[in-house]
Structures are given as structure tokens and as C-alpha cells.
């Protein structure tokens, strides 16, 4: 069974230590609930990932584990076969011992867009909410973060993350917990909190912003990326049914409306640092994710629209600061 003991040890003498009052019971329940099903099968695959520590580990400009010279071609093929069991791979790319995991998303492009606007991550304790398989977590570590914690309830994402971590070296200060943010107590401890590609999946977006705020220390930085539409501060799209074939998209605000939401949630220094239309080159089907992708979600006669007739995906990134506690919002 995947163990979280190294995480408990890591936070025992940190600003997160009070989390130990509740977290082991929550994760213990998760482990009991996943004794059967696909997780045990995936854990058998993880247990086969016995490879030497990589001769190189590049996290600053990419996520590259090993130079490709340590393994024979046969060993590389065996490793690739094991990693392919965890398909579909959505967020990346990763390079592992010469194997290029060409994921659905070019998540490195998003990182390059937002990185210049971040407060330095050096020595920071960072939370990535809805982290997927953890690609951006590794890039955060590459920027010098002291400890990176990701949360995502997906068992597949957890196993993909564990595979990469075992190949990179399990001593790395980076951990993924199979939790949703609603399972976190108000920790008031993280220097930086990321929420990228999550807000539009929340039935109550203001509550999500308040949950993010509750994880930050006072003066900590929120990095929020979500789908937006054009319009003024009163413009919000509520899809009637599906959006881009997704049935779990609830609210798409304009950038101006989202700024108001952040202000309502008692953030300050609110600024929109990037707005980008998702391109067919950034999100596409690959050999590692052979299912439908963005091109299948757009109107074939007009890629500025989804198949339902809504504006095509456009993503805005906001950065904001947690204000001093406001008793009216507690």
C-alpha cells in the first residue's frame, strides 16, 4: 500500500505539524477504502520500478530524470511498458531515462507563462490544489521550494506521481496526497498556493476561493488559473449542460468578474497576469493519451467555439495576496 509516513515525518517539525491531528485518520480511511479495485494492481507496477538513482535530475527548465545512458535499450523498453500501464498521461511532459512521456497537455508552456509573475519560490512551502500527476509540482521544486505538497483525489494521478518520484529519488521534498481541498482544515501555513484548472469545476467558486485563502499564511500568495470569457464585471457564463463535452463545468466568469470574486474573498493586490486562448498545439491527443482532446471539443467549422456553441477555452491567471484576517468572513 502507498505509504504517507515520509510526509508525516516531513511536517512533524514544520508549520504544518498541527495537520497531524487529523490527517493520518483521513488517509488511513482512504487506504482502507482502496484495498480492492485498480489501486492494488497499479501498486504492483510501482513495486517493479527498481532503478538506480538517476545520473541527472533537471527540474529547472524541464522535468528530466536520468540522461538515458544508464539503462540498456531492453531496460528502457521494460520501463516504458511499465509507465504505459498508467495511461492516459495528461499533464507533462516528462523525460525519464531517455523515455519521452508526451502528455496531452504541454504543461511546460503554462509554467513558462506564469513563472515570471510569481514571487520567488525559493525556500517556500507550496500547496498545489488539483495537481494532477504533479508536473507543476516538480517545476516548483526546481525553483527552489523547500517543500511542495499536492492534493488531488484521483488514484491514477497519485500512481503516476509515485512512479515519477520513485524514479527521481524518493528523498525529494515533494508529496501528493489523494485529497480534495474540502478535506483540508484551515492550515494558514503555506507561503504559496496554486489552483490551476480547478475553479470552473466547483459548484461554489467563492467557497473555493475561501478554502484557498484558509491554506495561506497571512501575506501568502495565491496563484489562480481558470477558464474565463470576455465581458465586464457582471459577466458570468453558466453552461446549460456541457462545456467542451465536460459535464462538470459550472461557472466561467470574465476576468473582471473574477477580480471581484477575489476581492470578495478578502484577497488584496489582485492582478491578472496572463490571458491565453488554449491552442490545439498545447492540448492534443498523443501516443501517451490517445483519447479525445481539445480538437474534438471544438466546433469543426469554427474553432473559436466549443461543440455546444460557447466561446472556446480561454484561461486567465491571477495572482493575489491573503489579507489580514477579516472577522466578517471567518
UniProtKB/Swiss-Prot annotation:
Keyword annotations of the record: Transferase, tRNA processing
Catalysed transformations (reactions): carboxy-S-adenosyl-L-methionine + 5-hydroxyuridine(34) in tRNA = 5-carboxymethoxyuridine(34) in tRNA + S-adenosyl-L-homocysteine + H(+)
A biological process term (GO) from this entry: tRNA wobble uridine modification
Class of the enzyme per the UniProt entry, highest EC level: transferase
Domain of life of the native organism: Bacteria
Disulfide bonds: none
Pfam families for the chain: Methyltransf_9 (PF08003)
InterPro entries linked to this entry: CmoB, Mo5U34_MeTrfas-like, SAM-dependent_MTases_sf
Similarity comment: Belongs to the class I-like SAM-binding methyltransferase superfamily. CmoB family.
Summary of the function given for this chain in its UniProt record: Catalyzes carboxymethyl transfer from carboxy-S-adenosyl-L-methionine (Cx-SAM) to 5-hydroxyuridine (ho5U) to form 5-carboxymethoxyuridine (cmo5U) at position 34 in tRNAs.
Subunit description: Homotetramer.
Protein's name in the database: tRNA U34 carboxymethyltransferase
Organism listed in the record: Shewanella woodyi (strain ATCC 51908 / MS32)
Gene: cmoB
